[in-house]
UniProtKB/Swiss-Prot annotation:
Catalysed reaction, written as an equation: L-threonine + NAD(+) = (2S)-2-amino-3-oxobutanoate + NADH + H(+)
CC cofactor note: Binds 2 Zn(2+) ions per subunit.
GO annotation, cellular component aspect: cytoplasm
Residues annotated for Zn(2+) 1 binding in this entry: 38, 63-64
Enzyme class: oxidoreductase
High-level lineage: Bacteria, Pseudomonadati, Pseudomonadota, Betaproteobacteria, Burkholderiales
Binding-site positions, NAD(+): 175, 195, 200, 262-264, 286-287
PROSITE patterns reported for this sequence: ADH_ZINC (PS00059)
Subcellular location: Cytoplasm
Protein name: L-threonine 3-dehydrogenase
UniProt record, GO biological process: L-threonine catabolic process to glycine
Pathway: Amino-acid degradation; L-threonine degradation via oxydo-reductase pathway; glycine from L-threonine: step 1/2
Source organism: Paraburkholderia phymatum (strain DSM 17167 / CIP 108236 / LMG 21445 / STM815)
Residues binding Zn(2+) 2, per UniProt: 93, 96, 99, 107
Amino acid sequence: MKALAKLERAPGLTLTRVKKPEVGHNDVMIRITRTAICGTDIHIWKWDDWAQKTIPVPMHVGHEYVGEIVEMGQEVRGFSIGDRVSGEGHITCGFCRNCRAGRRHLCRNTVGVGVNREGAFAEYLVIPAFNAFKIPPEISDDLAAIFDPFGNATHTALSFNLVGEDVLITGAGPIGIMAVAIAKHVGARNVVITDVNDYRLELARKMGATRAVNVSRETLRDVMRDLHMTEGFDVGLEMSGVPSAFTSMLEAMNHGGKIALLGIPPAQTAIDWTQVIFKGLEIKGIYGREMFETWYKMVAMLQSGLDLSPILTHRFAVDDYEKAFATMLSGESGKVILDWTV
């Protein structure tokens, strides 16, 4: 079958032919129709330090997808041939304490689709049936293909009550931009997002941001004054992994504020801990998606009017994958979709 793979320990990916995967007793085989390019795939493309330490070679990658079930193992229940599905990319052990307590997103033995095992940038993908998630007919293939990052945004944004709150989001990547729409959808008052990328800040405005701030030209203090915010932000969502962004967030938080961290900063990042201690801030690390509460919330929000369509900015046939990755690398895109049906 056709697949987009890392064949060499060097930058780039290669469109190649690989063996079609086999289906185990508890697995489903999905014929892929759409995939999306993730920031993780960009790390793999660039072959940076993280990728060199993490990604087996050779292996086809990718973990944002939608498709149709074409084969099932004999033990699979609850699915039918022809079901349209996406899937949870974190395959968990089912036996550790967190898994047995229903906290599978915290499994210490997680294996990532397209990271630690063969991925979705291929004509067919096999995953455990437990990880598959049915997509309602009213949700498009393009939207279903981004349920993985949409889930990251949902898990992060809904970690705290947002109704009537002032929310600061640092980092206007696709996940941060989707978090803007989620926060507004569930009732946040002011939603402010910061970055230095004007293209993506404009996308955030289209998604409902109260203010989209280029911090190279404008300060948060000035924005807060314009919005008549005298005490600070109630909730912070750190999506960038940039130390200076986290520092500015800490300074802008109200006493008793709550912060969810999804962005991954450098290992030895220093912060002013007095901001955390004296303000009584609550900080929560976020990893992946809650299985499968986050997925149900994603569907419910889309069915109740959440509009993510502005984030879907570019579409390419898979044969044009180099153009697709170049578009993502340019920084002037939202989510980039690869079509496996043409």
